[in-house]
A protein has these predicted regions:
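Short catalytic/metal-binding and nucleic-acid-binding patches
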Residues: 1-211
Length: 211
């Protein structure tokens, strides 16, 4: 692996261990804009979850007393891995276009440490660059990839669900676990037998020396 690609997968230097400032809630998911702190991001296709589940999700988020973020995330991940919806990202042209877009701003707007493009969702582990706003990064990325994907498959209309999940990385152990989770997602979803066999992922990319 080249020195540049090796640097690409190193753990960023974390700030002191504490829950950082920067939380906001523009929709019905809490989000975190915390500067140069690694973030685990998930965004998904507009039709990737049943409406009944979305309604239940919104209701849970209205009640601070009963909302269990970890349990809700686990249930949503389970639904995503079942491949609900049209799964436009199964099209290799679309998946490759999205992967290219993720890599385009690496080392510029953010530092990308891991990613995977699944049939109906995308996982990323990134660290925003200096003075880069996470919400702006995701808005730009999702807007561009939606337009390109719609062109490739000859459709119009909403492509991504507006809301995204983001979770800040606590420490080096958490960082390593998130990379493993992201890269094993295709195996867990029974799309391949080894992480490096999935072509739209950091595992595949790293196995081939970052080429």
């Amino acid at each position: 692996m080249s020195a540049q690609r090796e640097k690409f997968f190193r753990m960023p230097k974390l700030k002191p261990f504490h829950a950082p400032d920067g939380w906001h809630s523009p929709g019905y998911l809490p989000h975190f804009d915390g500067g140069e702190i690694p973030q685990f991001i998930t965004f998904r296709l507009a039709d990737s979850l049943p409406q009944a589940l979305l309604d239940k999700w919104r209701e849970q988020l209205r009640s601070d007393d009963c909302y269990d973020d970890a349990a809700l995330r686990k249930r949503i991940e389970l639904y995503l891995d079942q491949g609900y919806g049209e799964c436009h990202l199964r099209d290799p042209r679309v998946a490759q276009s999205i992967q290219n877009s993720l890599l385009f701003f690496d080392q510029d707007r953010y530092r990308l440490s891991a990613w995977v493009v699944m049939p109906n969702h995308v996982h990323m582990l990134l660290t925003p660059g200096p003075d880069q706003d996470l919400s702006a990064i995701l808005h730009s990325l999702k807007s561009y990839t939606a337009n390109e994907a719609n062109k490739l498959i000859g459709r119009t209309g909403q492509f991504w669900q507006p809301e995204s999940f983001d979770r800040w990385i606590r420490d080096a152990d958490h960082f390593a676990k998130v990379i493993a989770y992201i890269e094993n997602n295709p195996v867990k979803a029974r799309l391949c037998t080894k992480p490096e066999d999935w072509p739209f992922s950091s595992a595949w990319f790293r196995k081939r020396g970052g080429k």
